[in-house]
Design a protein with these regions (language model features):
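Long, charge-dense tracts
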Residues: 89-90, 94-96, 100-101, 106-116, ...
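Long, compositionally biased intrinsically disordered regions
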Residues: 111, 372-663
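Intrinsically disordered, low-structural-confidence terminal and linker regions
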Residues: 1-9
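Glycine-rich hexapeptide-repeat left-handed beta-helix
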Residues: 13-21, 29-52, 56-68, 77, ...
Length: 663
């Protein structure tokens, strides 16, 4: 924008409107500037003003014309059509965009050169330090995972810190920015904070040293009573109602409120925190805690629901709060659960009761951990048939609140993936070895300071086998869909993987599921200096995410021989039919188990408390009016439809394979 100096006439008019300046020569204005809407304003340092043409329509039908009233500006650029009034102290060292509304604020300033929260060290997982993550505007859950957990590679950590420092220094400035269409109302102190477009800050107490990365498609809302120090808040997030954050990163579309308190913590996409407390936690995508009595401390979580009163301890009153733990993706805690760190809980497991024996159940996913008389009992695989697990898997993609097209986290929602299925292979082998070592007639088996009952062990093996059948069958059907094969050779050619990437171990790096070989290749690239920018690291994660199904097939192809005893390179149509029959059996069997589990929610016991003051018939009628009946429940109907669709899908492939067999 071209600015001009004020005319003598304009200076006189401004003075008559109670305006002052240390040096009127340093006040420059837009070509069409009018003094009409500038009153009781003091200027110092270099000040640039835009035009004041438009009005703001406020709730209650009040109109306010853009302009400056009762404000002190020091080294400030004000864009077109802004309304700034009733600033108790001053605004210093800021560039303010157009159409921004700032009213009744204590002070807004940048003091010295600031990095606006970039480069702040967050002591995640270990309160005493050693796993610090340097936060930045482009931080993804996957970057943070590597930086926090791969400390056995010091060269990698040094390089990643270097990359973040480069970014932080590049964006450091002695001048802050407030974007376009921003609203800041009834707010206390804002110091060293960069504020993006379309942000709403209303009734906030204090913001110090941070970035609010709001934009038009994903605005950020900061609400009443909020206090944030040393922070970064990403697009589409809401921090409201007395939340207090200190040294925290808040990812995209997160919601923190109702007096939630967090320090040294990272919250990634779609996390929710209300009422409770977080300390040194790594909250991967969809970590949700709603209750006042819940403390999450020194743990790594993702796709997690914390029950009321869920607590952990990272302190054994010896060398300080030095312990940490992990609940792998999809793990949940019930009310009043407690875990003494260190411990590791397998994916999609449920934790009930108090667990103090440092169990590691990472190779037994989909389990229940239940405490009886201070002993941890493990029920392996049982969560595979839980209606809650299936409901969770369906709800997460629907609850993705990210509207920003530039997504920081690459989230894989699959319940069954090479990551979880490889653990089922290990879990099945572990359970078989336990049975072999202790004898088939043992009542109780011991595993990593946990106990497994005989019946639970036998069922666990069966659950894992059903899930493996389902996953491998899904992969084969997907690979062969939509093609009319004329010979076994054509089938084998189609089954052959497109790439060698995908074999071996897979990892879940906080939402992104990828082959370990690819993560290692990225790490080698960072160490060598080949990958040396934050955007390059994120581009590599995006590539892994977009190639997931290609890599997944490579892994599944190799597992066909291990599980079915069939060499894939010699596979025939009959072999495919055998796999699909097993798959149909697994899918339908699992869906029926899920339906049976859902049916418990419609039992007579579930009707307790319904039909107040009435007979049993009235109880049933009241229940039906409130909850509906089993047959018409949307979830149950979806499961029954799923059985129908999957059976038809399997039959269609079997039909194609039979035509090959007949040739």
């Amino acid at each position: 924008m071209n600015y001009r100096r004020l005319t003598e006439d304009e200076i006189l008019r401004l003075k008559s409107q109670s305006c002052l300046a240390d040096d009127w020569g340093k006040v420059t204005v837009a070509e069409e500037f009018s003094t009409e809407f500038v009153h009781h304003t003091r200027f110092s340092g270099e000040v640039c003003l835009g035009v004041f043409h438009s009005e703001f329509m406020l709730p209650g039908g009040i109109r306010k014309h853009s302009g400056l009233r009762h404000v002190t500006l020091h080294n400030v650029t004000v864009g077109d059509n802004c309304c700034i009034e009733n600033i108790q102290n001053y605004i210093a060292n800021y560039e303010i965009g157009h159409d921004t509304f700032i009213e009744n604020v204590d002070i807004i300033l940048v003091d010295g050169v600031s990095k606006f929260g970039n480069g702040v060290e967050v002591s995640v997982l270990n309160e005493t330090g050693g796993r610090e993550v340097l936060i930045n505007d482009k931080l993804s859950a996957h970057q943070a995972y590597i930086l926090a957990l791969y400390r056995h590679r010091p060269e990698l950590i040094a390089r990643m810190k270097e990359i973040t420092d480069f970014y932080s220094n590049k964006h450091a400035s002695a001048v802050g920015s407030i974007g376009n269409h921003v609203m800041i109302l009834n707010t206390g102190s804002i110091k060293n904070v960069r504020i993006g477009d379309y942000c709403r800050i209303c009734g906030t107490c204090r913001l110090y040293n941070g970035s609010i990365n709001s934009n038009e498609v994903a605005p950020v809302h900061i609400g009443h009573g909020v206090i944030c120090d040393d922070f970064i808040i990403s697009t589409g997030s809401h921090v409201d109602d007395g939340a207090m954050l200190s040294r925290c990163f808040v990812g995209q579309a997160c919601k923190l409120g109702h007096n939630y308190s967090a320090s040294d913590s990272l919250f990634f996409s779609n996390c929710q925190g209300e009422n409770g407390e977080a300390c040194a936690i790594f909250a991967g995508p969809y970590t949700v805690t709603h209750h006042k009595s819940t403390l999450l401390i020194a743990g790594m979580f993702s796709f997690m629901n914390a029950g009321s009163g869920s607590n952990q301890s990272n302190h054994m009153y010896k060398l300080g709060p030095i312990h940490q733990g992990t609940l792998e993706r999809g793990a949940k805690t019930t009310s009043d659960s407690y875990i003494l760190w260190p411990a590791r809980v397998g994916a999609f497991s449920l934790v009930m009761g108090r667990h103090v024996n440092h169990s590691d159940t990472s190779n037994l996913p989909f389990s229940y951990l239940i405490e009886q008389n201070n002993t941890t009992y493990l029920v392996p695989g049982v969560n595979l048939r839980s209606v809650g697990t299936i409901r969770d898997a369906q709800k997460w993609p629907k609850r993705d609140g990210r509207t920003d097209p530039n997504k920081l986290d690459y989230i894989n929602y699959n319940l069954l993936s090479p990551y979880t299925v490889q653990k089922m292979f290990k879990g099945r082998e572990t359970l078989q070895n336990l049975r072999h070592a202790s004898g088939e007639l043992s009542d109780i088996y011991s595993f990593h300071s946990a106990k497994i009952r005989n019946s639970a062990l036998v069922k666990g093996i069966r659950f894992y086998e059903i899930a493996i059948h389902k996953f491998l069958g899904n992969s084969v059907i997907k690979r062969l869909e939509g093609i009319d094969f004329r010979s076994n050779e054509e089938i084998r050619a189609r089954l052959k993987p497109d790439t060698a990437i995908g074999s071996g171990e897979w990892v879940d790096i906080s939402g992104l599921i990828a082959p370990k070989s690819e993560i290692d290749a990225l790490i080698d690239g960072i160490e060598s200096g080949k990958v040396n920018r934050l955007k390059s690291i994120n581009a590599e994660f995006e590539k892994m995410h977009s190639n997931y199904y290609t890599y997944e097939w490579t892994w599944a192809y190799e597992k066909l021989e291990e599980f079915y005893g069939i060499k894939p390179e010699g596979m025939t149509a009959e072999d495919v039919i055998h796999i699909v029959e097993k798959w149909k059996e697994a899918v339908v069997g699992l869906d029926r188990m899920v339906c049976e589990d859902a049916k418990k929610e419609f039992s007579l016991a579930s009707m307790t408390g319904f039909g107040a003051d009435g007979s049993r018939l009235e109880k049933e009628l009241d229940f039906e009016q409130v909850r509906g009946d089993f047959e018409s429940n949307p979830f149950v109907m979806a499961v029954l439809k799923h059985i129908e669709v999957k059976t038809a899908l399997g039959d269609e492939l079997i039909g194609r394979m039979q035509r090959v067999s007949e040739n």
